[in-house]
């Protein structure tokens, strides 16, 4: 027991002596110039002058590296809400077999293609958009990837068919798509066209830095690929119907696009100068709406 007690006292004495040793300061001493002391990033220079009191000058070295901003910024989950419509340039007298007319009834015409403006909705969901600085932050290249969802609600009871029995023909069949004036009244009658789309725009902004408030304007083009087309209808006689098929719509869509406003809310618009149908109808869509985006 005595040996254990003595050993404990010896260890405590050695530990106390070690703790009392003065810590070595983070200093650098220059014997040739003993009026200068460096402590980390602080340089202390002491100069003796003829004045009664010594003068001490402290020089602080700034080691902070300026932050480098990336020329590319990314915005995820951009959302558009607006309205779809189109300009009808169809020559109905030369539409051919795509339009089926009922014998004894007025011919299918432009009035049959009129839309319900308040219900024809355009929703765009951009998975991401990127902005590449070209001239400081005031001129940028904007591009991205997303989906365009267009819904055209018709006033008249028209129907689109991929193929099948031709109405009012006595049972004749066709493998070609067609549109006709139906015999029932629909409470809901829309043609939906959905696209994968890549926009490319030149952006001009007054904001000095990405994410800061400022006026912004962008103009450019977009390319879309049609991945879904369907005619959705509701009526008392037939109930709910969703007819998916190929209605002879163009697979690819080229559009002029633009946006205007102040972050995070701005206006957007698009116009397709060519028909979205391969033949028969000459329909040129346009959209307008509000975009919710960080920049």
Report each predicted region and the residues it spans.
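Residues that define the transmembrane beta-barrel architecture of outer-membrane proteins
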Residues: 73-77, 117-123, 192-198, 213, ...
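Short loop/turn motifs that connect adjacent beta-strands in outer-membrane beta-barrel proteins
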Residues: 65-73, 88-90, 132-139, 207-214
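Detector for outer-membrane/organellar transmembrane beta-barrel domains
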Residues: 189-207, 212-226
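Cleavable N-terminal export/targeting peptides
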Residues: 1-66
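Transmembrane beta-strands of outer-membrane beta-barrel proteins
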Residues: 75-79, 139-145, 196-198, 215-221, ...
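Predominantly the C-terminal beta-signal and adjacent terminal strand-loop region
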Residues: 244-295
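Transmembrane beta-strands of outer-membrane beta-barrel pores
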Residues: 83-87, 131, 147-153, 204-206, ...
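Extracellular/periplasm-exposed beta-strand and loop segments of Gram-negative cell-envelope proteins
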Residues: 90-96, 106-119, 152-193, 226-236, ...
């Amino acid at each position: 027991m005595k040996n254990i007690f003595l050993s404990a006292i010896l260890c405590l004495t050695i530990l106390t002596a070690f703790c009392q040793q003065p810590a070595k300061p983070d200093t650098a001493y220059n014997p040739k110039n003993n009026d200068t002391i460096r402590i980390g990033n602080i340089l202390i220079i002491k100069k003796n002058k003829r004045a009664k009191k010594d003068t001490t000058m402290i020089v602080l070295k700034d080691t902070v590296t300026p932050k480098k901003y990336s020329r590319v910024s990314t915005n995820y989950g951009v959302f558009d809400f607006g309205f779809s419509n189109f300009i009808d340039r169809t020559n109905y007298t030369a539409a051919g077999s795509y339009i089926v007319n009922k014998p004894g009834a007025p011919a299918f015409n432009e009035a049959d293609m009129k839309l319900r403006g308040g219900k024809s909705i355009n929703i765009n969901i951009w998975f991401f958009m990127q902005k590449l600085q070209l001239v400081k932050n005031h001129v940028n290249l904007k591009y991205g990837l997303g989906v365009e969802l267009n819904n055209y609600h018709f006033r008249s009871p028209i129907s689109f068919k991929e193929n099948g029995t031709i109405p009012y023909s006595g049972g004749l069949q066709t493998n070609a798509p067609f549109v006709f004036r139906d015999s029932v009244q629909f409470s809901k009658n829309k043609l939906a066209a959905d696209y994968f789309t890549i926009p490319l725009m030149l952006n001009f902004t007054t904001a000095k830095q990405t994410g800061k408030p400022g006026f912004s304007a962008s103009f450019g083009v977009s390319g879309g690929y049609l991945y879904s087309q369907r005619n959705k209808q509701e009526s008392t006689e037939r109930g709910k119907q969703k007819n998916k098929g190929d209605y002879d719509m163009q697979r690819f869509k080229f559009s002029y696009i633009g946006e205007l406003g102040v972050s995070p809310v701005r206006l957007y618009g698009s116009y397709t100068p060519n028909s979205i149908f391969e033949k028969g109808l000459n329909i040129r869509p346009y959209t307008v709406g509000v975009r919710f985006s960080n920049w």
